[in-house]
Amino acid sequence: MPYVLPALSYAYDALEPHIDARTMEIHHTRHHQTYVNGLNAALEGAGLDSEEPVEQLLRRIPALPPGIHGAVRNHGGGHANHSLLWTVMSPSGGGRPDGRLAADIQAQLGGHDAFQAAFTQAALGRFGSGWAWLTVTPAGRLRVDSSANQDSPLMEGNTPILGLDVWEHAYYLQYQNRRPEYIEAFYRVVDWAEVARRYEIALAELGREAA
């Protein structure tokens, strides 16, 4: 079965005034759909199916036919990255995390303010197109990072739990070249409950439920 564009759990205008409806619609139905189409075409051209989750596919790119490595990296990464992005934003988002995620951000990253400063710098410091990330390393540690283009932390063995798209298509209609304003707007829609859920899943997969 080919990969499909995931439906959003909210309307395109639900994140306004922080992220406008037109940007959301174009970003979802055109940009993300293009990545889905490109990934399906690459796999079909190589005679491969798409039965596994795209996240699993990205972890094993070296095992795929060399001729499709670039397409899977770009289109598969774009599909996985955007699929995460839609879920970690919410009309009722914003604020700060609580519970275990908040405690571990405090212990490992110096607290929420320090995390947000590092995440902002990752987003601002990414030259050109790319992403800012909060990930879980194979050692079960939180890490702030960035990646170029549509590269996913999954390709390096890390598990993303929060991601921000800093390609211009993600913000230019509303914010033009004002990337700092876009980053600040993103914090107002982050769904920390979803990020925390992803954190618990990542730790569980590493066998660190009680760590």
Curated annotation (Swiss-Prot):
As to how many cofactors bind and how, the note says: Binds 1 Mn(2+) ion per subunit.
* Gene Ontology CC terms, in alphabetical order: cytoplasm
- Any idea which positions bind Mn(2+)? 27, 82, 165, 169
Q: Which cofactor does it need?
A: Mn(2+)
Molecular function in Gene Ontology: metal ion binding; superoxide dismutase activity
Sorted alphabetically, the keyword list is: Manganese, Metal-binding, Oxidoreductase
Asked if the keyword Oxidoreductase belongs to this entry, the reply reads: yes
Q: Work out whether the entry's keyword set contains RNA-binding.
A: no
PROSITE patterns in the record: SOD_MN (PS00088)
Its Enzyme Commission number? 1.15.1.1
Q: Residue span of the signal peptide, if any?
A: none
Reactions it catalyzes: 2 superoxide + 2 H(+) = H2O2 + O2
Subunit note:
Homodimer.
The similarity comment for this entry is:
Belongs to the iron/manganese superoxide dismutase family.
Q: What's its job?
A: Destroys superoxide anion radicals which are normally produced within the cells and which are toxic to biological systems.
Q: What is this protein called?
A: Superoxide dismutase [Mn]
What organism is recorded for this protein? Bordetella pertussis (strain Tohama I / ATCC BAA-589 / NCTC 13251)
